[in-house]
Amino acid sequence: MNRHEWRDITQHVPLRIFYGHRILQLILIAVCSFSIFTSPLSAQTKLLIPMDLKQTDHLKSYGIAFWLLEHGGEADWLLNYRGGSFLCDYTDALAKECRIRGVFFEPLAAVEAASLYAEVQREDNNEDVVRLEKTPKIAVYVPPGFKPWDDAVTMALEYAEIPYTKVWDEEVLSGKLAEYDWLHLHHEDFTGQYGKFYANFRGAPWYIEQQMLYEREAKRLGYKKVSEEKKAVARAIKEYIGNGGFMFAMCSATDSYDIALAAENVDICDVMFDGDPMDRNAQAKLDFSKTLAFENFKLDLNPFRYEYSDIDLPPSDPPPIRDPNTDYFTLFEFSAKYDPVPTMLTQDHVNIIKGFMGQTTAFKKSLIKRSITILAEREGTEEVKYIHGNFGRGTFTWYGGHDPEDYQHSVGDPPTDLNLHKNSPGYRLILNNVLFPAAKKKQQKT
């Protein structure tokens, strides 16, 4: 209908009827406009998961990010913004999942999201955006009979509802690690000394069963001694890292791993461990060029001491006496735009974190290779808590201590209930590593 036809019609319509129709038309337009601009797809274009003190469950927030990637979505990790927050496209399904898991979120309109992106990416602001776009395939190195509460990482994965696959020696030695993006190791002993529990637990049923299991497995895989088989596993893991894998280790899986690499051609195990005496010149025969993180360390060859070397600080034998209320370590701050990797690994809502012990509590700074990035340390001491390094096309991150919420974990202690520690800063460092392989690589700024 053209404007002339419209005019002819209106000339034959009573004025009050015409204006009544026009008013109704304007009301309908206004209602439609309001419904469009207040619909969830428009008013709530983004969903922000803040990771500062407002967050109700920091640990499950990582699980939400993982869940989103699993379902084909993407998330932006806002480094150094409100504790390392996550920004995602808003959907009703995502909002529902957050509510189910008790994760606090804030819906953002398009203009708010645009303003937030601009703020984070300002050149004078130590913040940046990292896109998470790939679901990492996670493997956890554990022996048969392992329970999820046996180490902090599997407890964190279980609590955050992040799926993982268990692997052990056969999978590692047969090349199966190539199927995974991320490998975790915890309270392991790659030296073949069964955790150096001999002095206190050699008569315990669990110790005897473990030794028999390890000996059977080594023989089945074609090795005469457990120590030789574990060294082969350590070398296979090193090859996995070199080919682009991500390794995260805690507690004794850190120093015992490097010791196994350095002692590749040296017998460092006494007769009660492998049936023959150790090489008395073992220390002089160590090859530090084969290690990833440590050098110039001295082995503790006493089979009755619960210690592998002088890497561990403070030494585990005798057990150190410390006040948990005064034991803290400090995270270093990195440039989000120029050093995104260490920045990702240190995202947290606090930068001073309560300490915790383990068979390997921390690392002696003077024994750490210069190529390694120190992520956290106990200020005023030689104790380094958290380190990161590169090897080949892959990376490794090592974290001292056994359980961030169990200060002095002992054999037989009950598992930590993470429902009571859902905002744990120490556990957040573990989960930073889980999401790290999901990050899209971008060109380094120069």
Model-derived features: positions:
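Hydrophobic targeting/anchoring helices
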Residues: 43-151, 160, 401
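Helical hinge/lid and interdomain linker segments adjacent to catalytic or ligand-binding clefts
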Residues: 46-47, 52, 56, 86-87, ...
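Bacterial N-terminal signal peptides
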Residues: 23-35
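Catalytic cores of eukaryotic secretory-pathway lumenal/extracellular enzymes that build
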Residues: 222-223, 262, 271-273, 280-284
